[in-house]
Swiss-Prot record:
This is Small ribosomal subunit protein uS19. One of its GO terms (cellular component) is cytoplasm. It comes from the Bacteria. Pfam families: Ribosomal_S19. Keywords: Ribonucleoprotein, Ribosomal protein, RNA-binding, rRNA-binding. The gene is rpsS. Belongs to the universal ribosomal protein uS19 family. Protein S19 forms a complex with S13 that binds strongly to the 16S ribosomal RNA. GO terms for biological process: ribosomal small subunit assembly; translation. One of its GO terms (molecular function) is structural constituent of ribosome.
């Protein structure tokens, strides 16, 4: 389900403050965030965010194609180790 247009995109308030401070300082440090539900805005382009996936902060550098998506889309929370092999194929 898509968010209503009149509401606008959701962005955590602290995230905006951290991004503005990083832009003002000109430093390219990783900005640690826990808000996976926040929407990526055009003013975040060029910054690097450390998005928390439940274990660690995954570095995500923002480009123009990511605008409008959520931070959580770029930080997977589950690891897939593959299915077990076919036992019939091993015997033959």
């Amino acid at each position: 389900m898509v968010r209503s247009v009149w509401k606008g995109p959701f962005v955590e308030g602290s995230l905006l403050k951290k991004a503005d401070a990083a832009r003002a300082s000109g430093r390219h440090d990783v900005i640690k965030i826990w808000s996976r539900r926040s929407t990526i805005l055009p003013q975040f382009v060029g910054l690097v965010f450390g998005v928390y996936n439940g274990q660690k902060h995954v570095p995500v550098s923002i480009n123009e194609e990511m605008v409008g998506h959520k931070f959580g889309e770029f930080s997977p929370t589950r690891t897939f180790h593959g299915h077990s092999g076919d036992k019939k194929a091993k015997k033959a």
